């Protein structure tokens, strides 16, 4: 691999916007697969760039649709804010294989590690505890998990 984020040719996500569509725009030719929407949100909300949320996925609709999705998206948005992930935050791809992708993003307040794909076994050394700072699970679901760890406090 190139060590660049998926879907980029320059690795400069600050110059673009990420979007998970619901298919109610245009003719729906490039509809994001509904069964993978949360994987998509786990990616765009943990990685550098400018995430763009599809409104019906971000709020519970009056008829109750998307309630669980909206709650999980809100959790990920809050994690992104708390970690201080912005358009040009550094990202390091730790594993990129056919059944698992693991990356670490350095926000201004915390590091975030995201795992995408069906495989859950990866080397424990990828997420070591350092100086008493443990990784905390922020969100998880079918084929994704997100952890964060605050930066050391400065005296």
Question: What is the predicted role of each segment?
Answer:
Residues 2-155:
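Carbohydrate-interacting/catalytic domains
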């Amino acid at each position: 691999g190139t060590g660049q984020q998926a879907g980029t040719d320059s690795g400069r996500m600050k110059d673009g916007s990420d979007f998970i569509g619901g298919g109610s725009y245009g003719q729906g030719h490039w509809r994001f697969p509904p069964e993978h929407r949360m994987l998509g949100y786990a990616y765009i909300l943990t990685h550098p760039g400018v995430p763009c949320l599809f409104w019906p996925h971000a709020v519970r609709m009056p008829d109750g649709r998307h309630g669980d999705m909206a709650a999980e998206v809100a959790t990920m948005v809050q994690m992104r804010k708390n970690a201080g992930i912005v358009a040009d935050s550094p990202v390091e791809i730790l594993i990129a294989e056919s059944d698992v992708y693991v990356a670490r993003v350095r926000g201004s307040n915390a590091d975030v590690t995201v795992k995408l794909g069906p495989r859950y076994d990866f080397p424990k050394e990828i997420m070591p505890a350092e100086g008493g700072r443990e990784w905390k699970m922020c969100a998880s679901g079918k084929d994704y998990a997100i952890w964060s760890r605050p930066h050391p406090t400065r005296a």
